[in-house]
């Protein structure tokens, strides 16, 4: 993996080029990973995504917690050589990264053991040792993979729990550093330690003590329990820790921060030097019946962050979900129709909502890269913060409570929300 910085500024973060595989496509950073569940982009087939969201190569974010059951099948799939993880899930032509936990769902706390990491899968809790993890990575053959780490910390974690997360991660990673040569994939060094600067420094020190070339980048873990909790983080606590960490890390390695961070938090993290994020925020919005409507283009109109499609007020509103959006949903359908799909639990509802939210969020990142290049990220941040209003906009996502009936499971929104 190769990472080159194109430009860097004090106010706007940095613009870079990331080449994950020799001969593969280059990706501009700040980069947006495509979050998947069970190897698929939620609600969207490969054809729908590539036709109506983006035709460009993407980096798919796979998670072991949703794909662990595929290990045996992938061992046979890859035994012939030449085929990869993206081909297996029906998304050839895209690169991928393998993470441990699903950023879209809350990860249960507890279950930690001395030499074992709990992995919460669709089949329940699995015990994951360093040896077993490397066997799985060898079966999956991802382009990049996250090092095994204890990320069971958040703002409320006690000092003892934070220290244990660092110590256990060091033990896991020591084995992985020693055996990484058996896997032809780029390792990402995990940086853990909750909100404790001393613990974060210890985690960074252990990674930087490794021989040159041991890993290709850094991934920050342990700030939240994933799911909607990432949308409500107190940035006054988060940003100083991120700044503390980034100052101690090399500039020539990409820094990844998975999770459903709000658009405003993403902009503030980019200013701190974070390079890679994911689309779990777009998924969480879709799951909770929200169409992203925040503006990132300067105008004189006051905007709101979401359109709530459960709102009865839009049942006779025949305007597009977002008037200036060029996605399939906004070009062909109306707010009233989305509301109708919600009320009837039609499968087309979450499909159209996800198409819009991904399209909008990816356009947002295009604007971010343009702003970083022009050193105008502070102006974009201010627009996103207030949306031309007088107060800061709330981008947090609350869990939906308007599920119609469990009897409708397997159809549309209800299948995911129940």
Curated annotation (Swiss-Prot):
Binds 1 zinc ion per subunit. Its cofactor is Zn(2+). One of its GO terms (biological process) is tRNA-guanine transglycosylation. The keyword Cytoplasm applies. It comes from Drosophila melanogaster (Fruit fly). InterPro entries: QTRTD1, Queuine_tRNA-ribosyltrfase, TGT-like_sf, tRNA_ribo_trans-like. It holds the Pfam family TGT. Zn(2+) binds at residues 325, 327, 330, 356. One of its GO terms (cellular component) is tRNA-guanine transglycosylase complex. Belongs to the queuine tRNA-ribosyltransferase family. QTRT2 subfamily. Heterodimer of a catalytic subunit and an accessory subunit. HAMAP family: QTRT2 (MF_03043). It is found in: Cytoplasm. Keywords: Cytoplasm, Metal-binding, tRNA processing, Zinc. This is Queuine tRNA-ribosyltransferase accessory subunit 2. GO terms for molecular function: metal ion binding; tRNA-guanosine(34) queuine transglycosylase activity. It comes from the Eukaryota. Non-catalytic subunit of the queuine tRNA-ribosyltransferase (TGT) that catalyzes the base-exchange of a guanine (G) residue with queuine (Q) at position 34 (anticodon wobble position) in tRNAs with GU(N) anticodons (tRNA-Asp, -Asn, -His and -Tyr), resulting in the hypermodified nucleoside queuosine (7-(((4,5-cis-dihydroxy-2-cyclopenten-1-yl)amino)methyl)-7-deazaguanosine). Its main location: cytoplasm.
